[in-house]
Amino acid sequence: MKFKFNSDGKFKILLFGDIHEHTDYKTNPRFKDMQKLMTAAVEEFKPDLCVLLGDNCNTDIYTEDPEKFREMLRDVVAPITSRNIPVAAVLGNHEHDHGHEDEIVADYGKLGIIMRNDAPAKVTGNANFKEIIYSSDGEKPVFCLWFIDSNNCHENREISHYDYVHTDQIEWFEAESEKLKELNGGKPMPSFIFQHTPVPEEYELLRKAHFWELPVAVRGYNTKKKTFYVGKKGTMDYVGEGPCSPDVNNGQFASWKKVGGVLGAFFGHDHLNDFSGFVDGIFMAQHKTAGFRAYTDGCRSCVRLVTLDEKNPHKFEQQLKRFKQFGLKSESLGPVMRTFTDRQVITMHVLGYLALAAAGVTGIAFLIKFLIERFGG
């Protein structure tokens, strides 16, 4: 498939994180809610490409009944494929759980989902590949989309819980990037990175929380668990949990800066986070689940639309839109989770009521009101 900018010079990419669908989907209202969101999103945004950011379907069934897995995957993406919209996907850590990665990659391809391995077989990972977006006339390569396999858990959990993108993958990326420079007049081709597990530099979008911010702060993950974080000034949207990045920094982000041209990186993996911001000039965006199967905190399941402009490929627009913002009503969540939109809103409202009831002091009321407005939305 050859991607190119539309006649209006735009190219729209719609992102879905961590759907985690299960084999009982045909009778489960959580699947219906996910499909409501996916359907509403593709109908409203009319994307040129959809991207699934890993942990898309439960692979526990694969050993016993691979056909049931294929049927589930086919039904999950039906709102996209039935509208003849291309869809690409990366492998999440759970697609690696049972040792069927090569078969799963092949099954994605057979269903028309873009997933393959362009890297040499000796390179770590089962699905490292790229797609080029051409000019609207189809003649000139303009933009590159990288799809990187971020692997599973580290083989030594004392070093890191989650694995990272390995050195040989980084070397492959750098070598391929050099080839793209030749196609782009000797300059780095502007590009995006799509992968499941975030890089450690994502923590640079956060800062250590002050004690009065602890009700809305998140605990860091694994080796950072003794520290509580909130978003830095300039970090957009919702920090719902400590980013679950590797504990070892293997230099992937440094490689992006070295190669040049990487405008943004988009991750799944963390089911509550949808925050984003710039680190050293690279836009990094975390994607919470677009489904209702994984742990979540209300009707905040969302999608992200990224729009490229052929006339200015080094700039892009992006927006989040959540389940309730589409005017949808959940069939799978209880009344509390349907009413409140996230953990922080619930926490701050409870704290507000308790503080006001106990103290009745204007100063405390003002502080609680400020915290609700600042952090609770």
Locations of regions flagged by a protein language model:
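Extended active-site neighborhood of metal-dependent phosphoesterases/phosphodiesterases
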Residues: 1-5, 70-186, 213-217, 305-307
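N-terminal active-site segment of His-dependent metallophosphoesterases
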Residues: 1-70, 74-75
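Binuclear metal-dependent phosphoesterase catalytic core
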Residues: 2, 7, 130-134, 237-238, ...
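Active-site environment of divalent metal-dependent phosphoester hydrolases
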Residues: 22-25, 58-61, 89-100, 153-156, ...
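Hydrophobic alpha-helical topogenic segments used for membrane insertion/localization
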Residues: 350-372
